[in-house]
């Protein structure tokens, strides 16, 4: 995979150095549909992913999901997680305080949010999600000094996801009712980081 590309979203991932993790070197690479659409669509059609993302279908379904994030003025940046040179996860880093999510919890200015899916089944169930969540959250907090916390809202039925967030240093705040799911509001505070 070549060097990261410029992107339209609010998160400056293009100049973020890769993160060293126990699973390998992780780099966030902004999504480019011409390069990434087929792979992301394939991941969205994996039954485990489709059960919670609800974006199964042809590539047009995935393209329609990505389009608003790739347009100017978006508060969300879609990225591939490239682990030791292999694209293996999909991320959405977003300003939670500007998102519809802010209507469902006491948002603070500059709250960031994270969505994650592990693309290939061989990477699931081995603690990789926890490792990647910890690394990406640290990247966000390292590069966005006004952000005091990172939030997530996995479906409460997605026990492996909730567990990964907890193991990555997030705390369970409350359950919230969103239009598409009942979610576990997970929060990782800057003040509770395990490293400087």
Task: List where the protein language model places each region.
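Conserved acetyl-CoA-binding loop-helix of GNAT-fold acetyltransferases
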Residues: 125-141, 163, 167
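Helix-loop element at the rim of GNAT/NAT acetyltransferase active sites that forms part
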Residues: 42-56
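Acetyl-CoA-dependent GNAT
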Residues: 68-113, 117-121
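C-terminal "cap" of GNAT-fold acetyltransferases
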Residues: 110, 178-196
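Conserved beta-strand-loop-alpha-helix junction that forms the acyl-donor binding cleft
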Residues: 150-162, 179
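An amphipathic alpha-helix signature
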Residues: 34-41, 63, 67
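Conserved N-terminal entry element of GNAT/NAT acetyltransferase domains
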Residues: 1-34, 194-196
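Conserved acetyl-CoA-binding loop of GNAT-fold acetyltransferases
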Residues: 164-176
């Amino acid at each position: 995979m070549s060097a990261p590309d410029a992107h339209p979203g609010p998160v400056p991932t293009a100049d973020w150095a890769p993160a060293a993790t126990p699973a390998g070197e992780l780099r966030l690479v902004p999504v480019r549909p011409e390069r990434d659409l087929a792979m992301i669509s394939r991941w969205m059609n994996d039954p485990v992913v489709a059960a919670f993302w609800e974006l199964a279908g042809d590539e047009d379904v995935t393209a329609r999901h990505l389009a608003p994030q790739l347009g100017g003025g978006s508060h969300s940046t879609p990225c591939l997680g490239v682990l030791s040179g292999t694209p293996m996860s999909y991320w959405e880093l977003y300003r939670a305080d500007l998102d519809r999510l802010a209507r469902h919890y006491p948002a603070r200015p500059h709250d960031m949010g994270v969505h994650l899916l592990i693309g290939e089944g061989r990477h699931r169930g081995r603690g990789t999600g926890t490792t990647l969540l910890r690394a990406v959250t640290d990247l966000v907090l390292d590069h966005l000094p006004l952000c005091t916390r990172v939030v997530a809202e996995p479906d409460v039925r997605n026990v492996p996801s909730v567990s990964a967030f907890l193991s990555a240093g997030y705390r369970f705040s409350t359950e919230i009712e969103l239009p598409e799911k009942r979610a576990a509001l997970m929060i990782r505070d800057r003040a509770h980081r395990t490293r400087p």
